[in-house]
Amino acid sequence: MDSILVKGGGSLKGQIPIAGAKNACLALMPATLLSEEPLTLTNAPRLSDIRTMTQLLQSLGAEVTSLQDGKVLAMSCHGAINTRAEYDIVRKMRASNLVLGPLLAREGHAQVSLPGGCAIGARPMDIHTDGLSQMGAEIELKDGYLLAKAKGGRLKGAVIDFPFASVGATENIVMAASLAKGTTVINNAAREPEIVDLVECLRAMGAQIEGEGTSTISVQGVDRLGGTTHRVVTDRIELGTYMLAPAICGGQVELLGGRINLLAAFCDKLDAAGVTVTETENGLSVARANGDIRAVDVTTEPFPGFPTDLQAQMMALLCTAKGTSVLEEKIFENRFMHAPELIRMGADIEVHGGTATVKGVDRLKGAPVMATDLRASVSLILAGLAAEGETKVSRVYHLDRGYEHVVRKLSAVGAQIERIAE
C-alpha cells in the first residue's frame, strides 16, 4: 500500500492547473443513460472514482471510451440496457446511487445496490427514494438492493420538498424528472455549481429545466433527450485545496482555471486569515507574505457557504494560526477523523461532537500519520508541507479517488514530496 513522504519547510511558487470537478463528472456520466444519442464530456478528471463510474455504466450496457489520456469521455447508451447495478461495483463509491433516477426514468424499473464510498456519517438514501416515490415509484429494500418500479411504466411530475438541500438527491431527481410525464418542482434544492453544470448539460440534451443555482428547480419532462458535448466545470474542492498550499507554506501560486465565484465563502475566510487571493487572466493567484496566519472561525454549510469538503484542509492551516479557531461541521457527522492525526504532528485540537477548537501552535512537527478518508488525506499532506522534518502519510489510496497527480502538481511549485510503494 503506497505512502506519501513530505519534507516541510519550503515556500511555493509557480502554477497548478485545476482539473474538472469530480463531483460534477460523477453526476454527468449517468446522464448518458437518459439518451440513446452520444454524450461526450471534456475536461474530465483522471481519478479512480471516474473509472469506477465507467465500470458501472459499462455493466449497465453503456459504451464508455476514454480519450486523450482520460480527459475526454465519449459515451453512448443505445438499445436495450441492464437495469441492475451490482453490489461489487456500487460498494466502491457512494455516487453510484446516481444511476437510480436515470434508470428508472428510462426503463421504468431499476435495481441498485446500496452504495459505499468514504465512511463519513450516515448519508442515508431516504431523501432520494422519498422523492422518487412522490413521482410514482414503488421502492423496496431487499437483500441490500433498492428495487424500484414506476407505476404505469413512467414517472410522473410532482412537487417535492426536500428536508435538507441534498446534492445527490437533487441530481437524481432532476435527471429522473427530465423524462417524467409533467412538471416536477424541487423545493429546497441544492445550489452547488456541480448541479448548475449538470443542468446545463441536460438542457443541451433537450431537457426543459429552470431555476438551477437557486433553491427551487422546475423540470418539465420531455419524451426523449438527445446528445451533446459538454465541458466539465472546474473542481472547486481541488482548487481550494491547492489554494491552501501557499497559504500554509508561504509563497505565491497561480491556480489555472480557478474563479472566486466557485468559492466565495472560502475566499472570504482566507482573506480574514491573512491570505491574499486575486483573480488573474487565467485563474486565481494566492499569496502569503511573511506575516502570521490569523485565527478564524468556520462553519460548514451548503453552497454558497463554506464547503464541508474543505474543512479538513482549512483545519491544517489553522493549526499554526495566531489565536484560537472554532470549526463547526454542520453537513456530516464524524468528519473530524483527521484531528487525531494532526495532533500527532503537534497540533492543539479538541473535538466535542460537531465542533473542533484549534489553538494555534508555533509549528507542526513531521510524524507518521494515517489517512482516514479522501479530504483528510490531503489535509495531512498540507500539514506536512509546513511541518518541521518529514511526514509520512499512509493509506493514500483515498487520494486517488479525488486528486489527480497530487505529487506532480505540488512538486511543480517547489514542494518536497514523493510517493513510495510499500
Swiss-Prot record:
Task: Name the keywords, alphabetized.
Answer: Cell cycle, Cell division, Cell shape, Cell wall biogenesis/degradation, Cytoplasm, Peptidoglycan synthesis, Pyruvate, Transferase
Q: Where does UDP-N-acetyl-alpha-D-glucosamine bind?
A: R94, D309, I331
List the catalysed reactions: phosphoenolpyruvate + UDP-N-acetyl-alpha-D-glucosamine = UDP-N-acetyl-3-O-(1-carboxyvinyl)-alpha-D-glucosamine + phosphate
Where does this protein reside within or beyond the cell? Cytoplasm
Which Pfam family, any one of them, does this sequence belong to?
A: EPSP_synthase
2-(S-cysteinyl)pyruvic acid O-phosphothioketal modified-residue sites: C118
Give a GO molecular function annotation for the protein. UDP-N-acetylglucosamine 1-carboxyvinyltransferase activity
EC number(s) per UniProt?
2.5.1.7
Q: Which domain of life is it from?
A: Bacteria
Q: Which GO terms describe its biological process?
A: cell division; cell wall organization; peptidoglycan biosynthetic process; regulation of cell shape; UDP-N-acetylgalactosamine biosynthetic process
Q: Which NCBIfam families match?
A: murA, PRK09369.1
Q: HAMAP family of this UniProt entry?
A: MurA
Q: What is the protein's name according to its record?
A: UDP-N-acetylglucosamine 1-carboxyvinyltransferase
Q: Which gene encodes it?
A: murA
